[in-house]
Amino acid sequence: MPVPAPVLYPPFNILRLSHVEYMVRDLAASKAFYVDTLGLYVTEEGDGRIWLRAMEERGHHCICLTEGTDPSARVLGFKLYDEPDLDKAADWFAAEGLPTEWVERPHQGRTLRTADP
């Protein structure tokens, strides 16, 4: 299988995956798995959520567990290169007909939400 050619001049620059929010049925069991089995650290708990980070994570969290009835990966967050890239991403998603919304999220800076097609 050939390796696809890189996109050298993307419409905006993504540095890395930032965080994942998982919807889980049993918050205590999920906490035990991520903390006791995988060795992640709890950075905060409350209101049906647990924020976790790995040893080398520089931010507040890389995983958020949220209690709910439908287990799923609810959110994938990406770290962009800089603030202008966040504006470029908003413009690009809107031009592609995808929803865009500026949202407030605990422990995150300026945050843009969209949805994949």
Model-derived regions, located:
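A broad, low-specificity signal marking well-ordered, structured residues that form hydrophobic/aromatic
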Residues: 50, 63, 112
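Short, flexible, solvent-exposed loop/turn segments with mixed acidic/basic and small polar residues
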Residues: 10-11, 64-68
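Core segments of cupin and vicinal oxygen chelate
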Residues: 12-59
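Short acidic/glycine-enriched loop/turn segments that link adjacent beta-strands
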Residues: 47-49, 72, 106-110
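Intrinsic, low-complexity N-terminal interaction/targeting segments
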Residues: 60-64, 102-105
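Vicinal oxygen chelate
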Residues: 1-10, 16-25, 66-117
